[in-house]
Amino acid sequence: KIDTALSNLNAINMLNTKYIILQKDQMPLVNAHACGYAWNVNDVKLVPNADAEITELATIDPHKTLVIQNKYWDEKYNNALSSLDTNFKIEITNFSPNEISYKYSSSAPQIVAFSEVYYPEWEMQIDGKEQPIMKANYVIRAAYLPAGNHDIKMHFVPRIYNKAKPITL
């Protein structure tokens, strides 16, 4: 019964919650439905706004489908939806509070979800070239990744802090 309940908790699954503590004196439950730190999808539901995005979340399997607002989507990403690479591989090579690096390989372009909270101040580079990050499923990051073997670097650029840094009292 608990496994069925966990499979229906999209938010904790797409945020890669691997363990759930129900009572402090018991072993944590292993969540076999956690999506992982990054995964490719072959279906995207485009919606006009955040309210529609939240509504659609109840209808999807986050392992296969992302909900993305129209303003984040570019038509050139459509080719990635017809070519789900079952041999797609991605691994984290560096993880720190302000920077995450990955290596990935794919035989075709992919739409990839990342189990990291979306903030506009995060930027992404693929092999040193800027690439947009999309907000998906209301809270996580997603990106279009080209085919091949590539390095990804996501880093946090605190614009307000950097603007205020030269100001001293």
Describe the residue ranges of each PLM region:
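Extracytoplasmic
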Residues: 1-85, 107, 127
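Active-site-proximal, structured, solvent-exposed surfaces of multi-pass membrane proteins
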Residues: 6, 63-169
